[in-house]
């Protein structure tokens, strides 16, 4: 690394020039990366609901379905609206009553079940199907055009419409999130660093890995809107301490060496230090990639890539910036507020046993709270009430009793009698509002100019028959999941291969999938961190102690919502623990490394712990408070509950982690020092008492 460090310093201006040029293709990549706003599309393709969605898309042209509520319009005006919607690119078909019965015929001639579905007082409903899935930009653009055309007393409801509103909100909010995170991180850096200019230089340096990370996402094809919204905040919070370490080491080396030699030494020391800590952070994000819900892979890859790019930028690009602004950095200085702690370390040394007792007593109730925190899977409930799509979805519920729509697929070889009997049994289930099948359109008593052949194309394709079932229950509730289970039983009585699609079925699969993912990701992330720490320190005891300390912080963080009565979004329980584990392990490694270093210098156990706490405290607090500031700032402006909940948990987790590392970790290091000595290769032997005790 000596030669590499000297090469970086020698060619620093050329490296910076190349880095600036690389921003151009990265920016192009960013603007060409698709964003997925449909979280349900991340379900495994092997799940029944996703298989059903594929058939609905391939055979029935129902890749994406929304419902348009048209208020206070005549049938003639409604027909005109439908005609214009059908002209919009991306719309497969807008389906209304005139597809099967001319509007000159009184609506009373329509079967009662169809009347109930299409009319409610002065309102009527149209079914809008799209050529491509919900997450497609073509579908998003089509929805945007529909909303612009029908803005007068018409509301589009459904998952696709909600996704389009989410897109608009995210595109508006993401730059604001980034701006707030940068400003608040800089404020924390001003409090913790003597140099007034260094925080600005750090932010200039962070531009490179952030832009590179977003630009290289183009190779993934697409990323989720959650990843897009949080990536800047997380990358800033997780990798900023690498920059701080390089600056501190450079300033230290400058006291005894010329600037270029000092920077070369600083680069080498920084690379050695941040490589081990960054690997643990990367491992935490990589653990997300094993999730069946591929949203985890999406977040995991982007954030792991962001950490790698953060390390590379710190080693290759930041040295050039620090040396370019060197005189300015040294010239403008101010008094810091975040200084080394002295009273807290002494308190820990005196009361470490009491701290550990408190640690156990706190862990138990919060562990219970974490296991019993309420989780919501309903993607609609976390959206702002002023979204046009939410207003439309609520109107579907209030006016047409269409809270959730199920799409049932059965073999087209089933007889009319079997279909009617099956529909009758489904209608009798509690919470079913109505059932619509092709068989409703055929039979005696219908108008002579009724055209069932048009309807047949909608309800029968690809060897399957489609049955539409409207439920009074909300998706992701126990009532709806029980209803789906009973529907499965009825359907499979007539067709063993019968399937149910739609939001309700997909959300049921989401619950099943995430329950498995949650346990798997947590276990894997702990194992990966354990192995890396064990290899780093060549120890068995230290990974146990470090992971236990961090899991304590995670348990407190995830247990608090139980006691406050807060319901968390499903994604929080899967990703927060992993992110907090990956970010916090850096602090733990920093303090443990300093503890070992002081022991190797002949210090007693308590004295070594005291010095480790004092010398590590500023770095830990600056990094942790930066993480907190970046996330808490976003929470004040985030309108979507899913984003807001995630950043609040991350912000609170950062503070809890700082406290845990400063209080619990040194207490465990002191208490377990003999265990550490016996299970760690080349660990310095030492007695307990500090000098003067």
Predicted segments with their positions:
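Structured non-transmembrane domains adjacent to transmembrane bundles in polytopic membrane proteins
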Residues: 44-66, 70-163, 374-542, 548-567, ...
């Amino acid at each position: 690394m000596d030669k590499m460090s000297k090469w970086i310093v020698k060619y620093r201006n050329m490296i910076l020039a190349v880095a600036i040029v690389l921003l151009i293709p990265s920016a192009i990549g960013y603007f060409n990366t698709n964003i997925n706003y449909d979280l349900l599309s991340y379900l495994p393709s092997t799940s029944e609901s996703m298989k059903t969605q594929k058939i609905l898309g391939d055979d029935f042209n129902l890749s994406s379905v929304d419902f348009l509520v048209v208020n206070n319009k005549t049938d003639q005006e409604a027909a005109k609206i439908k005609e214009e919607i059908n002209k919009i690119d991306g719309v497969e078909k807008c389906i209304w009553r005139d597809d099967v019965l001319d509007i000159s015929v009184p609506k009373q001639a329509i079967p009662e079940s169809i009347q109930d579905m299409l009319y409610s007082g002065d309102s009527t409903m149209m079914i809008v199907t799209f050529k491509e899935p919900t997450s497609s930009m073509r579908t998003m653009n089509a929805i945007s055009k529909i909303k612009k055309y029908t803005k007068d007393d018409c509301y589009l409801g459904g998952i696709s419409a909600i996704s389009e509103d989410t897109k608009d909100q995210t595109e508006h909010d993401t730059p604001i999130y980034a701006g707030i995170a940068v400003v608040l991180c800089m404020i924390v850096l001003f409090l913790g660093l003597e140099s007034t200019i260094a925080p600005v230089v750090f932010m200039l340096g962070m531009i490179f890995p952030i832009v590179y990370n977003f630009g290289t996402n183009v190779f993934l094809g697409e990323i989720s809107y959650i990843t897009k919204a949080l990536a800047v905040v997380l990358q800033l919070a997780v990798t900023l301490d690498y920059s701080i370490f390089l600056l501190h080491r450079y300033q230290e080396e400058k006291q005894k060496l010329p600037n270029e030699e000092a920077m070369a030494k600083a680069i080498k020391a920084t690379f050695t230090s941040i490589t081990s800590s960054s690997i643990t952070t990367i491992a935490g994000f990589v653990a997300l990639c094993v999730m069946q819900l591929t949203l985890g892979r999406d977040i995991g890859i982007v954030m792991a890539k962001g950490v790698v790019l953060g390390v590379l930028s710190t080693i290759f690009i930041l040295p050039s910036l620090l040396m370019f602004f060197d005189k300015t950095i040294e010239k403008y200085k101010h008094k810091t507020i975040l200084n080394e702690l002295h009273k807290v370390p002494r308190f820990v040394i005196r009361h470490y046993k009491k701290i550990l007792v408190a640690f156990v007593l706190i862990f138990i109730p919060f562990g219970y709270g974490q296991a019993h925190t309420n989780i919501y899977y309903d993607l609609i409930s976390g959206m702002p009430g002023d979204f046009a799509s939410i207003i439309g979805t609520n109107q579907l519920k209030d006016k047409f009793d269409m809270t959730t729509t199920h799409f049932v697929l059965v073999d087209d070889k089933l007889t009319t009698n079997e279909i009617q009997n099956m529909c009758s049994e489904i209608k009798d289930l509690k919470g079913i509002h109505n059932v619509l099948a092709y068989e409703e359109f055929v039979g005696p008593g219908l108008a002579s100019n009724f055209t069932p052949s048009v309807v047949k194309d909608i309800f029968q394709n690809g060897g399957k028959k489609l049955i539409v079932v409207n439920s009074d229950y909300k998706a992701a509730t126990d009532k709806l999941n029980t209803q789906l289970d009973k529907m499965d039983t009825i359907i499979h009585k007539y067709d063993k291969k019968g399937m149910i699609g739609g939001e309700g079925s997909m959300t049921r699969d989401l619950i099943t999938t995430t329950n498995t993912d949650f346990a798997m990701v947590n276990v894997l992330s702990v194992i990966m961190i354990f192995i890396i720490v064990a290899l780093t320190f060549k120890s068995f005891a230290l990974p146990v102690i470090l992971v236990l300390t961090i899991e304590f912080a995670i348990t407190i963080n995830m247990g608090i919502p139980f006691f406050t009565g807060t319901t968390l979004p499903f994604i929080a329980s899967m990703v927060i623990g992993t992110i907090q584990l990956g970010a916090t392990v850096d602090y733990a490694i920093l303090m443990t490394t300093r503890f070992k270093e002081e022991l190797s210098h002949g210090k007693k156990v308590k004295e070594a712990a005291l010095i480790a706490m004092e010398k590590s405290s500023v770095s830990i607090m600056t990094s942790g408070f930066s993480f907190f500031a970046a996330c808490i700032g976003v929470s004040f402006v985030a309108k979507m509950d899913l984003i807001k909940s995630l950043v609040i948990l991350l912000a609170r987790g950062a503070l809890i982690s700082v406290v845990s590392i400063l209080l619990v970790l040194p207490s465990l290091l002191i208490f377990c020092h003999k265990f550490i000595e016996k299970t760690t290769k080349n660990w310095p032997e030492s007695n307990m008492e500090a000098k003067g005790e």
